[in-house]
Amino acid sequence: MTKLGRRNDGGGKSHRSSTKRQRRTSVSVDDPSPGEEEEKTLVVLTDDSDSEEDDKPLGDVLRTCRKRRVSSPKSVTLPNSNVLECPNCFDPLKKPIFQCNNGHLACFLCCIKLKKRCSFCKLPIGDVRCRAMEKVIKAGLVSCSNAIYGCKQSTTYGNQLQSHEKVCVFAPCSCPIKDCNYIGFYKDLINHFRATHKVSPGDINSFVFDRPVIFGLDLDSSDKMVIFVEEKQGNLFVVQGFIGSHGVYATVSHIAPMVPEVRKFSCSLARLRPYSTLRLGLEVKNIQKLRSQEEQPQEDFLLIPSYMVNGDHMKMEISIGDKNDYTHI
């Protein structure tokens, strides 16, 4: 009878494989859980193939199928980046990140300041690293804060983000017109200026680089400034006058962020009188917002002495060029 059983089965291995298929199929039917039903179904499909997994234990096959399941999402969006800040100093978290036994976090500098005592529960902190959060910080990408002004750069959270924003060419610049709240990319500023403020031709002085322009600076106006627009490239410059105890301090500014990618300029600024001229070569500062009249400049200005200030109107001349054109002899 033993021989007949072997002859009818066609071999012991086939009998064991059949039993294994029946046992696994019954498990997939008995469990009503959707997640596990999907997993058991995968096992059944694997068993019906001719692969070598017929001889593997059920536990090994289940583990193999789990690895074949659909991977997790490639990106995650955080509604608020505050979760990536140190809860003590509120600076961006960066390696190393430490945690106490209750799971409270602290950056390296805060651990030193707190003398390795958690600020929330007073337990020791500073010896156990929070590797999970360090991985999140390392893998996370954050958009530049200037994205609303056109920047498309994304960097890892922490030091790299701060480093990028310090040199981002899309850093916002304010319109030089008083009481205007417009803020935007510096190359868009001139379009806003012309479209919104409807200024008359005399209020904007057009010029070409390295060509002198004669203009008047009125000291009786509230803003005491003159705006210049370069005809070809549209760069926006402002000459401001600040009245001080020794005379008038005249400055020249380029409305743009102070970053390496933005072109740097210098200028020749002169006070013209019938029988005398006061001239100075100046470095033109890039600024994102004009100084108020209360902020007297400390550097890079032409001081026009009181004896050369006659009345409220001064005749002046300016020529603007590249960074070293007017500051090096």
UniProtKB/Swiss-Prot annotation:
Zinc finger (SIAH-type): 139-198
Comp. bias intervals (Basic and acidic residues): 1-12
A biological-process GO annotation: ubiquitin-dependent protein catabolic process
GO cellular component: nucleolus
PROSITE patterns, A to Z: ZF_SIAH (PS51081)
Keywords: Metal-binding, Transferase, Ubl conjugation pathway, Zinc, Zinc-finger
Ranges of compositional bias, category Basic residues: 13-24
Zinc finger (RING-type): 86-122
Catalyses which reaction(s): S-ubiquitinyl-[E2 ubiquitin-conjugating enzyme]-L-cysteine + [acceptor protein]-L-lysine = [E2 ubiquitin-conjugating enzyme]-L-cysteine + N(6)-ubiquitinyl-[acceptor protein]-L-lysine
SBD: annotated segments: 136-325
Pathway: Protein modification; protein ubiquitination
Residue sites binding Zn(2+) 1 per the record: C144, C151, H164, C168
SUPFAM superfamilies on file: TRAF domain-like
Residues holding Zn(2+) 2: C175, C180, H192, H197
EC assignment: 2.3.2.27
Region Disordered: start-end pairs: 1-58
Molecular function, one GO term: SUMO binding
Domain notes: The RING-type zinc finger domain is essential for ubiquitin ligase activity. The SBD domain (substrate-binding domain) mediates the homodimerization and the interaction with substrate proteins. It is related to the TRAF family.
Primary role: E3 ubiquitin-protein ligase that mediates ubiquitination and subsequent proteasomal degradation of target proteins. E3 ubiquitin ligases accept ubiquitin from an E2 ubiquitin-conjugating enzyme in the form of a thioester and then directly transfers the ubiquitin to targeted substrates. It probably triggers the ubiquitin-mediated degradation of different substrates.
Family from the record: Belongs to the SINA (Seven in absentia) family.
PANTHER family: E3 UBIQUITIN-PROTEIN LIGASE SINA-LIKE 4
Designated name of the protein: E3 ubiquitin-protein ligase SINA-like 4
